[in-house]
């Protein structure tokens, strides 16, 4: 029944909304500096890799029986077991206050709250939220609209599924060497990532052939794969350690807000410009990406875009 599906989906959403910022907050709690950037990258890589594997396995199981894909929802049992181990680890470390006190003091010194009584630099947090929302909105064109564009050019649904899988694999890839990427690009990291996304969207838009759509999807994914974990790391610098999870929750909220609003915004703009072209989302998001690229490049020395590792 539809109401049962809605309830189950809502419960899954609530669970994810609680778990994701809490688990990400653990990274900010136990790691600082370059190691924190590396861990955020690995976390992002593992998350996106798991997404690709789960999607592939679910598709295979669905061919056997429609009941089997729901076995995926048993995977959180592994997380429950790991949480028990984490609880034991925390109780062990609580016995050693000297080692525990070192990291928070470093974190507190690194966090600039702008004198806020809430323990969070509100202006910096809002900048991160806006930027994360915009970049997520940009890449949603690949997730939501690529299959329709490829259908228009007479590609099969299997081909579009392959392209989207490559996109998620590309998001995963930078996570394994994120610290090295940031160390090389420094304050130009986000600008060059946006440039990669812009080139990717342009390739998808202008080329109705697989051999240009494939690198297009990969370039968009690579750019987003760098930006996403770097924004999580940047968020931890806006808040005191005890407020980091709350700040991360606000930032991650923009991801889901962008997903929620994207179809309505694109539909509204298509009606406004009297077009139902399948290329429109890619052209519109390409323009947003170009504008955001110049913003990131010209403001590369500001808090939001300066990613020099310390």
Predicted feature residues:
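Cytoplasmic helix-loop-helix junction between adjacent transmembrane helices
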Residues: 8-47
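Juxtamembrane intracellular "pre-TM" segments in multi-pass secondary transporters
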Residues: 88-128
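Paired small-residue
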Residues: 3-11, 211-219
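Symmetry-related core transmembrane helices of the 12-TM Major Facilitator Superfamily/SLC fold
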Residues: 69-84, 280-297
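Helix-loop-helix hairpin linking two adjacent transmembrane segments in secondary transporters
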Residues: 33-34, 42-85
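Helix-to-loop junctions at the C-terminal end of transmembrane segments
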Residues: 173-186, 270
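Extracytoplasmic gate region of multi-pass secondary transporters
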Residues: 124-165, 171
């Amino acid at each position: 029944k539809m109401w049962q599906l809605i309830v189950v989906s809502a419960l899954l959403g609530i669970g994810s909304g609680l778990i994701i910022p809490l688990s990400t907050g653990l990274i900010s709690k136990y790691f600082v500096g370059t190691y924190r950037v590396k861990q955020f990258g690995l976390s992002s890589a593992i998350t996106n890799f798991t997404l690709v594997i789960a999607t592939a396995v679910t598709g295979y199981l669905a061919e056997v029986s429609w009941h089997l894909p729901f076995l995926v929802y048993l995977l959180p049992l592994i997380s429950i077991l790991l949480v028990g181990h984490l609880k034991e680890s925390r109780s062990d470390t609580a016995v050693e206050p000297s080692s525990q006190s070192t990291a928070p003091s470093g974190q507190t010194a690194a966090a600039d709250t702008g004198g806020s009584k809430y323990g969070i630099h509100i202006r910096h947090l809002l900048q991160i939220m806006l930027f994360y929302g915009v970049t997520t909105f940009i890449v949603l064109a690949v997730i939501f609209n690529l299959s329709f564009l490829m259908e228009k050019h007479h590609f099969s649904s299997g081909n579009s599924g392959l392209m989207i899988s490559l996109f998620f694999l590309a998001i995963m890839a930078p996570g394994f060497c994120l610290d090295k990427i940031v160390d090389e690009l420094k304050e130009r990291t986000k600008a060059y990532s946006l440039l990669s996304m812009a080139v990717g969207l342009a390739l998808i838009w202008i080329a109705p052939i697989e051999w240009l759509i494939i690198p297009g999807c990969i370039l968009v994914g690579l750019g987003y794969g760098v930006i996403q974990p770097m924004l999580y790391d940047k968020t931890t610098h806006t808040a005191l350690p005890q407020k980091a999870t709350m700040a991360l929750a606000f930032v991650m909220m923009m991801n889901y807000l962008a997903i929620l609003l994207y179809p309505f915004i694109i539909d509204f703009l298509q009606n406004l410009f009297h077009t139902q072209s399948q290329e429109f989302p890619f052209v519109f998001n390409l323009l947003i990406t170009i504008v955001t690229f110049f913003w990131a490049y010209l403001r590369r020395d500001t808090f939001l875009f300066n990613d020099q590792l310390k």
